[in-house]
Amino acid sequence: MTPELNWLSDPTVFAVNRLDAHSDHVCYRTMQEAAQRHSSLRQPLDGMWRFVWSSCPAQRPADFWREGADLSGFGTIRVPGHMETQGYGQLQYTNTLYPWDGRSALRPPQVDLNDDPVGSYAREFDLDAGLRGQRVCISFQGVEQAMYLWCNGKFVGYAEDSFTPSEFDLTPYIKETGNRICVEVYKRSSAAWIEDQDFFRFSGMFRPVYLYAKPAVHLADIWLKAGLSEDNTTGLLTPELKLDGETEGVSVTLRLTDPEGYALYEGPVTGDTIELEGIQPWSHKTPVLYHAELTLKDAQGTVQEVVPYDIGFRRFEMKDGIMCLNGERVVFNGVNRHEWNPEKGRAIDADDMNAAMAVLKANNINAVRTCHYPDQSLWYDLCDKNGIYMIDETNLESHGSWQKLGAIEPSWNVPGSLPEWKDCVVDRARSMLERDKNHAAVLIWSCGNESYAGEDILAMTQFFHAKDPSRLVHYEGVVHNRAFAAITDMESRMYAKPWEIREYLESKPEKPFILCEYMHDMGNSLGGMESYVKLAEEYPQYQGGFIWDYMDQAIWHTDVMGRKVLGYGGDFGERTTDYNFSGNGIVYADGAEKPAMQDVRYWYASPADRAAQDAVNAAAAAQADRTLAEAWQSRRAYPLVVTQGDDNLGVKGKNFEMLFSIAGAGPASLKVNGTEWLWRAPRPAFWRASTDNDRGCGFPLRAAAWMAADVFVTYNGMKVLEAGPDCVKVQFQFGIPTVPGASAELVYTVEAQGALRVDAVYHGVAGAPELPCFGVKFETFGPVTRTVWTGLSGETYPDRYKGGVFGCHEETPHVEPHLVPQDCGMHMQTRQAMLEQQDACGHTTAALTLQQVDAPFAFSALPNTAQEIEAAQHITELPATGRTSVMVLGAVRGVGGIDSWGTDVEEPYHVSGEEDHSVSFRIVL
């Protein structure tokens, strides 16, 4: 057969000579190999390959695959890996728009061959001893996006589908020594129209590549159908096997052992169902796996292969419109997870997966959706072992073919109901199911993501139902085309508002409801999660959701200033792009948890555990209130010394002195034990830096006057209300240049007990825009190196604080490394905060303590002002000023989280400009 370049633009050509998809089992030659998990029947081809990158097919080395071709001009590339992360081609992130939008006028299934980069790979090898004399196949676990394969100068095959294995038989072409494999990988093909996921657009062999041998008889496919009877103690095991090769007279035996190693069954595989008593059901709380070992013998009784596989017995079904696992309603406390590493992109390894699993386990996450493609097989093993429920999603997304600038316009949607696309999308469903069918963790098959709806996706569902009735089928896209409601077994939506979900659940629906995506965690987000979790406690048919998403997608690179920074869309010179819209993780790109994670952990805990934490917090807060009140009441008073100057009113007390400046509109100096704390006089605070969610809903535009007011407030004068040895009280009045205008005042009371009380008041006015916040702000003269506070742990906001644990906490002032800097570091319900300066050895040299007066306050201490943060596009752009910006607030806007492109924060977490706001606190001197 002669390979054709026009296959790239033909959706009916997606697999040429590709072997049938099969289960992800590993064959070992002996029981000893199986015990050691090292197979002599496999030979990895990972490592350095010869490589040439070409900008288009016309520029590629067209004959490099010929036997004896001179490859001396080739460079090298690492496999697994993407071309783009290794310096070949253009890094590009885009969400909905196709990468060629505005550059090539294309319609499905066209490909612009003048803009289709090609990677030419070559690898030379000798066969390992364990593979010689047998049939030899090659497995590409993931190649993006289309590949042609040659072996020793002979064309072998062609394949698409970036995220499931493509395997080929090399037996007619392979030699014991001196082999050369050649692969052409094309970045774009007709598959690009249905692989339009919201991610960086890569190409290359980014998952492992290996050879495997088939003995004379081979276990080509296994399906260990592990069910559970209604009594939840009787397991039902039906092995279905496919043998390949010389099958006459062969035998297969099965040995099944429990977690303690006791044999539950040992005997021949006949195709009959095996009943097993005393089985422990598999679930999130009890992820019990049983070890199956299949032994294949030839007609002479010689062991040909041994296949181990861990299986879980469980029963997943729809009962009265509710999804049930082992007879009990299941609630998905889930997250969407892209495969990601900030150095290697989607070419992740076991360390990445183990780290992600540890995060899921530590934060009460019980489910994961493989958005929007099947993951590496190891991830499924980890989910089996750790009881993580899975929605396994087909590699299908085509939102660029029907979403046009926010409008639904499916005139050239693919796959739709187009017959030429049907086989390729059903093949993608088949490849996923066949590989992953043995995994207990997979409860639901998903037809893909955001691809509208039509006959072709319906055919995928029909395949899933016919092939595997033990699982349900998911697809969200029918919400846009209800004519194909039969595609999905459940009502699935993205970013629906709580009231919209409630409306559905009140309608007595036939199908249960899940959110396949919710809580869009872009930047500083995840506010209002309570509104969703509470639905699960009220409505049995609300069965949870999957946060968007697990990890920020960003890539380490060196910027134009020579600084190493996590780059996002546009940082690499690419257009079109969606900039930082890939930064939606509950962990950063380097795997560190974002501050919002404590609320994920709280809301994904059981109601009983949440109630217990609430009770502990309430008791600890009450004790802190009593302790602080008693400490204040026991403080001794010392006479104040007041000095009236021309511009300044000076006040001295025990261990402190300060100057109130008429011209400076506030305290110009505050010294405690000789240390100056104020860079400039405090001012009313009206602005916190915009978050991604703020920008998405247009809040900065609506509230822009407050940004100006935060910098250009009008000083209307100083009044000395009291000045004596027991008390000095000074008022500063400010006019606010909003439309309509408003006013605020700061009142400072120096108390003889050694404290400066600060009272800030904002006077609301009808028609004033919403505020980002209100309180007091000041910059310290020198840097604060540590803050210690009594209040809730971590970063908290009005709509995201329940996960905080009340106690004494500390941190180094810092700006959170969101892809785009934004407001961060807020601490709600604070009773006391201590700002510390330290020497090089970490010893505290000075400290300033802020305490509540009548009620707790919110505070933040950051190395940059709100304006500096607002102006930066990367954390490396923030200036180092040597100061710390402190805000003490009585009102602060929530961060929101329903989505990041239009929905405002929930109403209770707005700060009205028409209402009065105030905050009071003491600076203990």
What do these predicted ranges mean?
Residues 216-245, 595, 599-617, 629-647, ...:
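Surface beta-strand/loop "capping" patches
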Residues 2-19, 35-36, 50-54, 74, ...:
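Accessory beta-strand-rich segments of carbohydrate-active enzymes
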